[in-house]
Amino acid sequence: MTERELLKDKKRIVIKIGSSSLTHAETGDLNLAKIEKLVRIISDMRGMGKEVILVSSGAIATGRQTLGGKKPETVAEKQAYAAVGQARLMMVYQKLFSEYNQTAAQILITKATILDDTSRTNAKNTFNELLKLG
């Protein structure tokens, strides 16, 4: 059975995309053609009634490229790059999804979110509400 056949009957699909899939290896720039293709595939899946959750890396890589910095070595450098990169990444997702009349949302989850019962429940409820709203 192929991967497509396995997904055919699934209602909810989670897609994890890493930094290397979002950026050009040579330059570190966002690979907008690849991201646009991903957005188109997700929009098509949603059009078929699938609930799709995109788990996206890339904030640090995008921030590093935007700021023209070296590879981050400290937590502070990683957080600074991520702060800039996450905003840029979400801007790209918002723009591309809007071309398909789709809305992108962002939920930031940490290990602490998962470990704390209240935080985990709140995150779960947020996911369910977003999926319900479409």
Per-range role (PLM):
Residues 1-134:
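Nucleotide/pyrophosphate-binding catalytic subdomain
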